[in-house]
Amino acid sequence: MSHLRPFAALSLAVVSALALAGCATATEAAVDASGAEAETISFTWDRNVAGEGEDAAYEETTVVVPKNPNNVVVFDMASLDTFGALGGEIAGAPLGSAPAYLSDYLSEDAFNSGTLFEADLIEIEAQQPELIIIGGRSSALYDDLSEIAPTIDLSIRGSFIETLERNTTFLGKVLGAEEEAAEALAELKDGIEEARAVTADAGTGLALMVSGGKLSAQAPSGGDATGRNARGGLIYDVFGVTPVVDDIEAATHGEPISFEFLVEHNPDFLWVVDRDAATGTEDAQPAATILDNAIVELTTAAKEDHIIYLNPTAWYIVFGGLETTRIMIDDVLQIAK
């Protein structure tokens, strides 16, 4: 099997061995259906069993999964990205949400496993998967899916970079592609450093989500890219953009703001995610149309042609994974052109 799918060329480096909090893996031996010994690997994480945010309750969960599994079902798009980029093939996924740029990672006869929020349990059980991967929006499906097959949750927890390293390293072990995983991570680390070098001299920025004709500002995450802080945390904390405002309220889709807010704080760059484009909202006005008005034209970002439209699928739907992180890097590097 050729493990690593092609990436855009970025400089390579060597990634050191990773030992990340909240994740533990161990290779074990098991017996498969034919009676032959089969290798397995375990994954440990703190599973959210109740509540959200400060009220969330967690339970340490360890799941043993087979190496080189067959009939893998993936609900988490970032995991679909990484699993496929490392040479794995996905048998089932929420096909209505899988982006076109990841379609090559699906088997030719891939089945629809449901949506990002709801699983087709009957169809999944009929396909007899050996591994199910969830994360983010699909995390709540764990109890039902774990009754069908070994199920692991690869949601972002804390640092975006540490999560990317943890998940890529683990999936590399599952697929026997450890070296390829390390090389891919090195490539992305170099790309992120290149992007940070560009943003270091770019003045201030504001991460902005546009949806339904309304604007919302994204908050810096303080290093925690989980949940409500995710998108702003990435542009500021990972890619080094200096926030024009520090005290934005952390919310699932950001803090609602007016067009006048943009003039008042006047960032040098606007980093825009078009949520309606990401979700395929019918008859929605594009973010570029919404921002093409007399008020926005008063901002430095508009005058200097510094309104950067980020890939909406990568930044809103997938949000992680090897190929998607490369797309994010390229989005940020637009300002160097």
What is the predicted role of each segment?
Residues 71-126:
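A short, structured surface patch at a secondary-structure boundary
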Residues 147-215, 306, 315-337:
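Extracytoplasmic substrate-binding proteins
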Residues 97-100, 219-254:
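Alpha-helical, coiled-coil/dimerization segments enriched in small aliphatic residues
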Residues 58-59, 113-120, 249-258:
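Short helix-initiation/N-cap motifs at beta->coil->alpha
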Residues 124, 128-134, 150, 262, ...:
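Proline-aspartate-enriched helix->loop->beta-strand connector
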Residues 268-337:
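Structured C-terminal subdomain patch of bacterial secreted/periplasmic proteins
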